[in-house]
Amino acid sequence: NNMVAGDFSNYDGTLHSEILWRILDIIEEHYNFEKDYRKEDAIVRRCLWESTINAFHLCGDELYKVDHSQPSGNPATAILNSIYNSIACRYVFYESGLTDFSSKISMIAYGDDNILSLRNDVKDLFDQDVITRGFARIGMTYTDEEKTGRKYNYKQLHECFFLQRGFSFNKMINIWTGPLKLRSILECFNWIKETTNEYEVIEGNARMAFAELALHDEKIFKNNTAQIKQALVNVYGQKPVSFTQTQYLMWLRDGHLTMKVPELNWA
């Protein structure tokens, strides 16, 4: 019941070089455990890191060097941003006068998205408002995960979203599920890559969509699966195979859903 979920505005543009350099230290700690660790490799990594966070840019005939952030196309972007997110949240926590982050806060970060669960004894000391003001002091703009501007202290898990997925306790299979936002599900029909068998690709998208829709309520599942089937019949003259919502949920419960529906790209 004590959840905070958030996102940042202009995340890449507000990264601090001090924290970015600390991320390299964390990465180096990982390499220190390797049997074939060499100082020469560490020097190379440091040079690569400097060229990332203090990159040179050429704009017209002006050459300048940035003092923070990272260039577009950095292959480590997701990893770097996730670690930065985790460090920055801890910094704000400790700057708020609190101690022992790991025992009082459960946090997941991916890129500039995060979701936190607050222990009861800190929920009023480190809520959304405190976190937002803490980030503002270091020049970062923290907002709710849907960027609505809505202000709250904390909320329940079923009100949160993380990476476009919500949280819903399904009483039929007695587990929490992560329904993908409806817009994200249906967007897969808006475009496909060039192919010699368009229907085969669209049908695969439909199978994926049916499985994702099964995580929503019964009305949403039935209405949208029916519309998708009819649309494919109208355009291609063929109806894609689907199963009952109960069947999808049972497969999910038993850990077989991605085997039955391989089009799902769940990790």
List the model feature ranges, each with a label.
Residues N2-Y110, L116-L125, E159:
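Conserved polymerase palm-domain catalytic core
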Residues Y64, H68-P71, P75, D121-E146, ...:
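Active-site and adjacent loop segments of nucleotide-processing enzymes
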